Design a protein with these regions (language model features):
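Active-site substrate-recognition segment that forms the wall
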Residues: 81-136, 142-156
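Helix-loop-beta segment of a Rossmann-like dinucleotide-binding subdomain
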Residues: 1-8, 31-33, 124-132
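Generic structural signal for small/hydrophobic residues in well-ordered secondary structure
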Residues: 10, 49-51, 84, 125, ...
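Short, well-ordered alpha-helix to beta-strand connector turns
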Residues: 13-14, 45-46, 188
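Central helical "cap/lid" subdomain
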Residues: 41-95, 157-159
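Short beta-strand to alpha-helix junction loop
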Residues: 1-9, 17, 134-146
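Flavin (FAD/FMN) cofactor-binding core of flavoprotein oxidoreductases
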Residues: 145-146, 152-189
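A conserved short coil-to-beta-strand element within the FAD-binding core of flavoproteins
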Residues: 18-33
Length: 192
């Protein structure tokens, strides 16, 4: 399944507003008023789930919400991520790997995941947080090339023809400290 499959399933019976940025969450008489970034109300809601990085959520949440204090200490590591597609299958020996002594933290063969198209070889590479921090602002094409070279090195495979590649700077990748609380809620459980 795709990463958004759960959300799509849960939203099946809901009216979804796409291409809409929430600019403010404001207390209302019966819950919360969501305003778009132009200040227009999108309606009042009993409960709100904010699923963005803590640094961004703290700006969005109302100042009187208890959550701002709770989430203000949460910080994230960055990660450069590369997706590459290959014309030929690479291997059937593994689906994922955590390389040791490498600038790569994780390698995944996405086409081996359930319900994914296995007709094409797709590899996702995640760089380590330390390496990614040092490469903030780097040229994505140069990052992709460097991480692909590292992939060939740690995998021991001979380089293969790439049909496409894309690098993405993921500013809020993983929490610096593991969060054991699950999710954060305000006192009456109306904002998570």
């Amino acid at each position: 399944p795709a990463m958004n499959s759960l959300c799509k399933h849960l939203a099946n019976a809901l009216e979804i507003k796409k291409q809409t940025r929430i600019g403010e969450i404001r207390p209302a008489d019966s819950g919360w008023d969501l305003l778009n970034d132009e200040g227009e109300s999108l309606g009042q809601f009993d409960r709100v789930v904010v699923s963005i990085p803590a640094e961004q959520a703290a700006i969005l949440l109302p100042r009187e919400a208890e959550l701002v204090g709770q989430i203000s200490s949460v910080s994230f590591h960055p990660c450069w991520s590369v997706m590459a597609g290959f014309e030929q299958p690479l291997t059937d020996q593994w689906a994922g790997a955590f390389p040791q002594a490498s600038t790569l933290a994780w390698i995944a063969r996405n086409n081996t995941k359930p319900e994914r198209n296995d007709a094409f070889e797709h590899v996702v590479l995640h760089a380590t947080a330390d390496w990614s921090s040092k490469k903030e602002g780097a040229d994505p094409a140069a990052v992709a090339e460097e991480l692909l070279q590292e992939f060939w090195r740690v995998s021991g495979m001979a380089p293969s023809a790439i049909s496409y590649q894309n690098a993405h700077w993921w500013k809020y990748s993983t929490p610096v400290q593991k969060q054991t609380d699950g999710c954060y809620l305000n006192k009456n459980g109306t904002i998570a």
